[in-house]
Each structure stands twice: as structure tokens, then as C-alpha cells.
């Protein structure tokens, strides 16, 4: 019995020695894995007057021109605000002003997926939200009401910015 007890003790020591042989050795390496996400949204817009908008008589809903908008990066709508824009009866309009800043006529944006907004979120201004994730949009601007216009150059100021839920 003594022999077998010694054999068991030797086997136990071998097993313990094997267990101590497994483990970490050497130094520990440290890696900081930084990542940069370069998601950038850029917005630009251009204006082109409609060739048929010559006056002096203009009809209600006559096309004044087109806002061509490029909106890169992830977004689900584009907001368009107008300097001096207002909402009346649920319809947002923007003034086209003369050289002295006096309103001469009003324009509006309307169409599928376009909602009039009392506050677009752009500097608290009224305008429109175009529900679209497209990169390029061509948004028509039409007259609000009919009028007879004097000769001159009239300007509306639009602010365009992307929106993401």
C-alpha cells in the first residue's frame, strides 16, 4: 500500500506541475484602436429663373424658378426657410423684394412630400420641409396670387438645410 500511495503522490505532483506550466508569459501588449467617422453632410443650392416668368402680368401659381439643391450625407428631409417668410391659412410664402427691401410679390413651394412649416427649425423662420433622402432635389417656386409686376429685379432669400431624425 505504501508503494501505491507513493505512486499516487507522484502522479498528483506531476498533475500539479502540469497545471502550473500553463499561463501567461512575457510582456503584455496594449493597443488603442481609435476610429474616426467622417460622416459629413453638406448642402448647397442654386437658383434659376423660369424662362417664362417675364411679367408684367403673372398668374397665380405661375412658376417663378427652381431651387436646385444638393444634399450629401445621411438625411431624411430638407428644410427650406425664407427671409421674411410667413404662414397664413396654413400656406407658407416668401416675399420677393425690390432693391429697397420692399415686398413686391410672394412666392411659395408646393408639391408632393412638401409640407408648409410655421417654423422650419432654421433660425425660427417659416418655410417648407421636403421629405426626401435624395442627394439632388429640384424644387419649383411659384407665385402666390396673381399680380401685375413693375419692371425691376426682385429677390427672395432662401436658407436650405438638411434634417435627420
UniProtKB/Swiss-Prot annotation:
Disulfide bonds: none annotated. Structural subunit of the sef14 fimbriae. This is Fimbrial protein. NCBIfam families: PRK15228.1. It is found in: Fimbrium. It holds the Pfam family SEF14_adhesin. One of its GO terms (cellular component) is pilus. Residues 1-21 form the signal peptide. Its main location: other.
Amino acid at each position: 500500500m505504501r508503494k501505491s500511495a507513493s505512486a499516487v503522490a507522484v502522479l498528483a505532483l506531476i498533475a500539479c506541475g502540469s497545471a502550473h506550466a500553463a499561463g501567461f508569459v512575457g510582456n503584455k501588449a496594449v493597443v488603442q484602436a481609435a476610429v474616426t467617422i467622417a460622416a459629413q453632410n453638406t448642402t448647397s443650392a442654386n437658383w434659376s429663373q423660369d424662362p417664362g416668368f417675364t411679367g408684367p402680368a403673372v398668374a397665380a401659381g405661375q412658376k417663378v424658378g427652381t431651387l436646385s439643391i444638393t444634399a450629401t450625407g445621411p438625411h431624411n428631409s430638407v428644410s427650406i426657410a425664407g427671409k421674411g417668410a410667413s404662414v397664413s391659412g396654413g400656406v407658407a410664402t416668401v416675399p420677393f423684394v425690390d432693391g429697397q427691401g420692399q415686398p413686391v410679390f410672394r412666392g411659395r413651394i408646393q408639391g408632393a412630400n412638401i409640407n408648409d412649416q410655421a417654423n422650419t427649425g432654421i433660425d425660427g423662420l417659416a418655410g417648407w420641409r421636403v421629405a426626401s433622402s435624395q442627394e439632388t432635389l429640384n424644387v419649383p417656386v411659384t407665385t402666390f396670387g396673381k399680380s401685375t409686376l413693375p419692371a425691376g429685379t426682385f429677390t427672395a432669400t432662401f436658407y436650405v438645410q438638411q434634417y435627420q431624425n
